[in-house]
Amino acid sequence: MAGARAAAAASAGSTASSGSPPPQEPGLWELLEEFSRTQYRAKDSGGKSGSKVERIEKRCLELFGRDYCFSVIPNVNGDICGHYPRHIVFLEYESSEKEKDTFQSTVQVNKLQDLIHRSKMARCRGRFVCPVILFKGKHICRSATLAGWGELYGRSGYNYLFSGGADDTWASTEDVTEEDFVLRSGDTHLFDKVRGYDIKLLQYLSVKYICDLMVENKKVKFGMNVTSSEKVDKAQRYANFTLLSIPYPGCEFFKEYKDRDYMAEGLIFNWKQDYVDAPLNIPNFLTQSLNIDWSQYQSWDLVQQTQNYLKLLLFIMNRDDDSGLLVHCISGWDRTPLFISLLRLSLWADGLIHTSLKPAEILYLTVAYDWFLFGHMLVDRLSKGEEIFFFCFNFLKHITSEEFCLKTQRRKSLPTRDAGFTVEDICMLRHKDRGSTTSLGSDFSLVLEHSPGAVGSFSYETVELAPAGAPTQAAWRKSHSSSPQSMLWSRPQPSEERLPSHHGLTEAKSSSSSSSNHSDNFFRMGSSPLEVPKPRSVDHPLPGSSLSTDFGSWQLVSGCGSIQDRPVLHTDSSLPFSFQDELPNSCLLTALSDRETRLQEVRSAFLAAYSSTVGLRAATPSPSGAIGGLLEQFARGVGLRGTSTSTL
């Protein structure tokens, strides 16, 4: 545990070592202070707090307007929903001329508003299906789960159903079955009516996939079923949708995350609890292309579970159809914003949405819109230690790898094989694969391709190495462009895989590829240091390298390290590579990618702002003080704070 805490502290301090604070969004600290002080309510628009909320709302509209043409659905005073934004943004199309011609919404806002008003009572707390992300013309939506009879009738009568959901208290109701109550009410068509409008809204938004994060089939409160879900609708009203039951722990579980000094690795949910009755259920056509053993989901820790669910959601959105996606939990303000935020940030990091926003700006938009304005109760969660909000942005370090990337790679003559590698991977070839820049008698193909934003790549355009048996030649063509590039290598799969066992090496598990599928494509163990050119000395290693040593005019970088400077190769020189006899059939070693850089900047900006406003609450005093001083160390290192004034 102490080692894990030290690693976390080192991660936070890596940016601090650069001596410059991460870029900050004006107003982010004010947003976090307001967020940690009170829960947002659409009807509370007066006074000092109201002016702050107005600034937050205005800033969100500005940030959406950078890249999208959108309409605003008014929710003044919470007329539609008391804990949805007062200005609900409906994204119509990207404002760039290219994207405008490619994807354009066919939704009429007036009709959408009408369906929203009619369908709002169908879902828990009036939290209707709301589109929040536009990707390739498809809407990613959020909502609460379906309201059960207990909510429909058990609050303050029918008046509540049309009041905008201002009253969140639960009323006592006789514990009878849903069927009995419907018969007693004399309105046997009530569920057909309200859920029928909900279905019409989903269809109007072209939503086909519904992802249910609940660990229960129905939420039981005060001895009665207060909510339901699409997967247990007795009338099978949602049979035409693709329903996915992907149970994920509720906010209560994140108290254990906090009590473990904010370490998610090794934290496994107890699936044997009495109230947990919703098994994982995903259609086969969605799982066949993902190298994940879904039958083992109950053995995944929090990191693996979150990673695999995010991969599934990204895969669904990247399918070649026009179908949208709905993500929901029970109330839709804890687990739902977690995955909506991760989807938004992951797609942004790939340059696929919000393309003009900087890291600090996308962070502000995500915190403000996905969490604050959609009613996450941060004050209550902090008081209980249920820090799912902090987990979300701290988790970005686990999704930096290319396995989460949806950006299409532009390849030049790459054989159809599984693994992709950078130039460093040549160093990992077996002895029989050794060669030079002019003659390589090996059994692999190598292609250099553009990888926008990659750090430390060669400024050469093409390298092609032919398979064994053919005349082999590698030509380096110097490029006038400064755009970064990467190198991909694939070779036949051997019948057996063995990880190398080298004396004196330490195990290094990549936090961004700790998925439970144990894919062969991803590096997991430390390997012998490999040589890469070092044109000049480097004072500070890049974050992510586990071993870095200077050796003459070369720099030794471990298998999971990154090239720290742009190396220079000459056309008349041999590649200064060393090889190993026994290595895994495939592994992934990358320079710091554009995706990783962007997500790291978002996470760093969040930690800096969070440390100065909210701060971490240590569960128990730690002798090492590692977690207690995690954010404090970060803030001091980047010059954000002189002396501590709050308890972290």
From Swiss-Prot:
The modification N6-acetyllysine is found at K193. The modification Omega-N-methylarginine is found at R636. GO terms for molecular function: phosphatidylinositol-3,5-bisphosphate 3-phosphatase activity; phosphatidylinositol-3-phosphate phosphatase activity. The active site is at C329 (phosphocysteine intermediate). The modification Phosphoserine is found at S516, S528, S578, S622. A 1,2-diacyl-sn-glycero-3-phospho-(1D-myo-inositol-3-phosphate) binds at G332, W333, D334, R335, R381. Glycans are attached at N225, N240, N517. It catalyses: a 1,2-diacyl-sn-glycero-3-phospho-(1D-myo-inositol-3,5-bisphosphate) + H2O = a 1,2-diacyl-sn-glycero-3-phospho-(1D-myo-inositol-5-phosphate) + phosphate; a 1,2-diacyl-sn-glycero-3-phospho-(1D-myo-inositol-3-phosphate) + H2O = a 1,2-diacyl-sn-glycero-3-phospho-(1D-myo-inositol) + phosphate. Coiled coil: none annotated. A 1,2-diacyl-sn-glycero-3-phospho-(1D-myo-inositol-3,5-bisphosphate) binds at G332, W333, D334, R335, R381. GO terms for cellular component: perinuclear region of cytoplasm; ruffle. Transmembrane segments: none annotated. Residues 494-506 have a biased composition (Basic and acidic residues). It is found in: Cytoplasm. Residues 1-19 have a biased composition (Low complexity). Keywords: Acetylation, Cytoplasm, Glycoprotein, Hydrolase, Methylation, Phosphoprotein. Its EC number is 3.1.3.95. Residues 1-27, 471-544 are annotated as: Disordered. Belongs to the protein-tyrosine phosphatase family. Non-receptor class myotubularin subfamily. This is Phosphatidylinositol-3,5-bisphosphate 3-phosphatase MTMR14. The lineage of its organism: Eukaryota, Metazoa, Chordata, Craniata, Vertebrata.
